[in-house]
Amino acid sequence: GGFGGKETQAAGPACLCAVVAYHTGRPAKMRLPRMEDMSMTGKRHPFYVEYDVGFDDDGLLHGIEMDLAGNCGYSPDLSGSIVDRAMFHSDNAYFLGNATINGHRCKTNTASNTAYRGFGGPQGMVAIEEVMDAVARSLGKDPLEVRKLNYYGKTERNVTHYHQTVEHNVVHEMTAELEESAEYAKRRREIIEFNQKSPVLKKGLAMTPVKFGISFTATFLNQAGALIHIYTDGSIHLNHGGTEMGQGLNTKVAQVVAEVFK
């Protein structure tokens, strides 16, 4: 698949192999023991987060300040964009209103961290979900009720902290459908009763939304193209500029074309 480890992490071994090939005049290949591979390659950025949040007795947020510090390791790699994306996802599906979000890229004496599934998004979302849990605990409310109260609206309270209007918002309907189909309220009551009777073994149940941005902050990358030929027998020939590396791109593009010509 098109995962982040393929972006920059191959550069080191490629350079080492190039040096060997240059000096020996022969093809070179590097095969690392798993222990060395795991020690030297980048992982997901650990984050340290501090926040101050203001909310009313219902759990509605009125203001938040958040500092996100990413452990980048010894080199920048892709940490700039990763911390950016963490900042952009520190709202998840919630209207923050008066928000100040600061991102810090921290150089540390560790292996350089790199692109990893979510690319900073999960770290930002985990931070705001902790805020929602903390607000719910403070007020003694069901965390899901606090989350629903702070969801983005459809026509109001629908602009992100980076000034983008949230369109096609179906989070309210999705949550209602999932609450019913998963029997959330019933199961949560049962879990609370179980925990009260069980001094050691505990259970938990939570429902959290996800709003994930799919574009690049380098806006020129947000483009694609395809060439389609329609033949007299009704068949369609499709060419596109993407690279199929296991992520199922050819199938997905074919589905888009089928939808357009439906």
Residue ranges of model-derived segments:
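Beta-strand segments within the central parallel beta-sheet cores of soluble alpha/beta enzyme folds
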Residues: G2, G25-M35, H62-D67, L96, ...
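Short acidic, glycine/serine/threonine-rich loops at helix termini
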Residues: F3-A10, S39-H45, M66-D67, G73-G80, ...
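Short coil/turn connectors at secondary-structure junctions
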Residues: T24-A28, Y48-V49, D56-I64, S90-D91, ...
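Structured beta-strand/loop patches that form or line metal/cofactor-binding pockets in enzymes
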Residues: A28-Y51, P209, G213-S215
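Glycine-rich loop/linker segments at domain edges
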Residues: P46-V131, G213-L221
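Helix-loop-helix junctions that connect adjacent transmembrane helices in secondary transporters/permeases
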Residues: Y151-S235
